[in-house]
Curated annotation (Swiss-Prot):
Record function comment: Essential subunit of the Sec protein translocation channel SecYEG. Clamps together the 2 halves of SecY. May contact the channel plug during translocation.
GO-annotated biological processes: intracellular protein transmembrane transport; protein secretion; protein targeting
Protein name listed in UniProt: Protein translocase subunit SecE
Gene3D superfamilies, A to Z: Preprotein translocase SecE subunit
Membrane topology per record: Single-pass membrane protein
Database matches in SUPFAM superfamilies: Preprotein translocase SecE subunit (SSF103456)
Gene Ontology CC: plasma membrane
Length: 69
């Protein structure tokens, strides 16, 4: 029973490593233009999240000031 469980685990690990190898074989380094585009999108996302946090923070701070003088 233990041997079959070990074989199953080893086969799963072997399949995972095979899939990782396949991904690494087809992946490539991004071009400069792709890198710049990814950086812009990431920066825009960070700014958007910061803005949403600010929009949530300001009313809460204002309401706290009204409740506790």
């Amino acid at each position: 029973m233990q041997k079959s469980k070990l074989n199953t685990t080893l086969n799963g690990l072997k399949d995972f490593l095979h899939q990782c190898r396949r991904v690494l074989m087809i992946s490539r380094k991004p071009t400069r233009q792709e890198y710049i585009t990814i950086s812009k999108v990431t920066g825009l996302g960070i700014c958007l999240l910061g803005f949403v946090g600010f929009v949530i923070h300001v009313p809460i701070t204002y309401l706290k000031a009204l409740i506790k003088p």
